UniProtKB/Swiss-Prot annotation:
This is Ras GTPase-activating protein 3. It comes from Homo sapiens. Gene3D superfamilies: C2 domain, GTPase Activation - p120gap, domain 1, Pleckstrin-homology domain (PH domain)/Phosphotyrosine-binding domain (PTB). InterPro entries: C2_dom, C2_domain_sf, PH-like_dom_sf, PH_domain, Ras_GTPase, RASA3_PH, RasGAP_CS, RasGAP_dom. Changing residue 601 to Q: No binding to IP4 and loss of plasma membrane localization.
Amino acid sequence: MAVEDEGLRVFQSVKIKIGEAKNLPSYPGPSKMRDCYCTVNLDQEEVFRTKIVEKSLCPFYGEDFYCEIPRSFRHLSFYIFDRDVFRRDSIIGKVAIQKEDLQKYHNRDTWFQLQHVDADSEVQGKVHLELRLSEVITDTGVVCHKLATRIVECQGLPIVNGQCDPYATVTLAGPFRSEAKKTKVKRKTNNPQFDEVFYFEVTRPCSYSKKSHFDFEEEDVDKLEIRVDLWNASNLKFGDEFLGELRIPLKVLRQSSSYEAWYFLQPRDNGSKSLKPDDLGSLRLNVVYTEDHVFSSDYYSPLRDLLLKSADVEPVSASAAHILGEVCREKQEAAVPLVRLFLHYGRVVPFISAIASAEVKRTQDPNTIFRGNSLASKCIDETMKLAGMHYLHVTLKPAIEEICQSHKPCEIDPVKLKDGENLENNMENLRQYVDRVFHAITESGVSCPTVMCDIFFSLREAAAKRFQDDPDVRYTAVSSFIFLRFFAPAILSPNLFQLTPHHTDPQTSRTLTLISKTVQTLGSLSKSKSASFKESYMATFYEFFNEQKYADAVKNFLDLISSSGRRDPKSVEQPIVLKEGFMIKRAQGRKRFGMKNFKKRWFRLTNHEFTYHKSKGDQPLYSIPIENILAVEKLEEESFKMKNMFQVIQPERALYIQANNCVEAKDWIDILTKVSQCNQKRLTVYHPSAYLSGHWLCCRAPSDSAPGCSPCTGGLPANIQLDIDGDRETERIYSLFNLYMSKLEKMQEACGSKSVYDGPEQEEYSTFVIDDPQETYKTLKQVIAGVGALEQEHAQYKRDKFKKTKYGSQEHPIGDKSFQNYIRQQSETSTHSI
């Protein structure tokens, strides 16, 4: 979901690795241990939660989280909670990283000190207010000044203990006076619309005996200030909770009698002091935040066209895509946007075939084919993740769930056996699990996605042509990906492939490790399988699988998935679970009385239907066939005073649903829109608000069947597997080329050196693969020109945006230090560029 900004789309995403916490304060009980979990928050909205690590003051989480960020935010925060089964979970501490500081920690493991959490540390939100100073004549004929302070509204206030009933106090304060007034309480909203005006008499001539006339300009303007405090009205005995404050000196009225601005709320000046950072422990994180500013498609045509013809360039090492892989620090950086771009334009198979064939030609030993982290290997990995994720789930998820739920002991290392465990029983348990997983894989060939099969066919042909004396190389070239890089890693770490929500427990993790090792060896078709294990107990266990039927099953499977032109008519017809989870739904009006209006339900989406159930595994309470989904749109918060709501519109009614957070709401809207995109009766207009009390809240139309009053949002690609924005991927590639511009220039030098010098290669150029210096130089020149043109467009956009930026507007409230730094930097840049 992109934020539109005058024709330019802004995409935000974050990839997080939550490592471990250390030296948490001990629990004040006899055990001193804690049961802790970590949450990821956009400001204070939780978007992810790790598993609970029990009885530890140094919990290891080892969890990964990725999301597209659908809204603006100021801080990426991480809270460490201590679980309490009897009371509300307590916060131990938090890490808050300002959005502008995220690049400092980009893709680096970093230890952060946990900070104390109190009312002042949790301040967030902004306030819109107006000040107006006017002269009035009193009944006695004396002229005095009156200040009108209007509190218009607030946005994004924190939610305290699940609720927010805010009010504001407005105080005119000076050295010798303090006069306070209070707004009404606004119930159940963190975006209150106050629109209240308070009047203060600024000058009081009678109180000044030494002067017959009071000079506002000379005396009061530097001494008085307006202070606005936001509070959450509470029924608890501890009193109302502080939400934030702002202070405005009346000197802002020197130039004009009126003033209007947005302000960020701030903590109190005398807020409670934090504990020493090392009192609360620390948290290890790795954060990759990406922000893409994407222009319209025509801006990217030169660079995109250059990339898309990479498969046709001879040699392929002189192509723009291959050059990107050469200059990036890690091949994975280049592979991700390249594969997505080529998939979007249907060019991934010829491109991967070209670079894989070139790699095979450089390989000397058939036993090491595709074993390195080359661009070809990384591109195939990425293609399997994108195109094969549903195939992976259909194939492995039932077996993985059974292993996690049955929890049978499978330890076969005699040294690690627990008391009471039997080695033979454990071996039999493990053998049954391996058989179940192995057969699930080898019988899934007909479901393998076509794009993967086409790539495997090209790998097989290239390997067989290069190593004609090795009859098995046509199998190992394919198995090195489908087994070694696809199935085995998914079995080993199912949470990384969304097969499980979190890391598995230690016993299950050990079982999956043993299964993964065995399946990987079975798939490798190694001639000396027992010798491939370092551990003697694994070699002993593998004797169970020395029968020829296992090798035959692997070969039949590999033959099937690497066949040319195979198409599976059943693959699209099979029900595929696309997304599931708990959400809140509103009753659809079948019973008007005696029923709770909002209920928690388990939702499940397949490529056939959208259903909800009382709980996971139950029979569906309601089902919507995909062809009956006419539109999926956000629902305005004012409809039910609830955030993160959306509507699934059907022919007869709309189903109103509340997701758990903004990220989850975006994910559901996107996937539901995708699967219903091809429906012939999709709506073009809809009602953005609910139908309540006999009319639509948005347009006031009385009929529940009245046509919509707002246009439906733009559709997404209909392919249920892939949602790729070609312009965004080209922008990503531009950013990488721009980041590694010095390497591009160095590569140009290397081409020139190779063209004129025939001797030993200079060491500084030896890292580049340059088969044809002239062709490579030609492509480099085009790449640098394309990147330069886009860089100029970005620079012009920044200059134009800076000219239009107003400090104190709703988009850029006063009080953001990082924005002040931005203003200063842009001012300096503009000065230098004149």
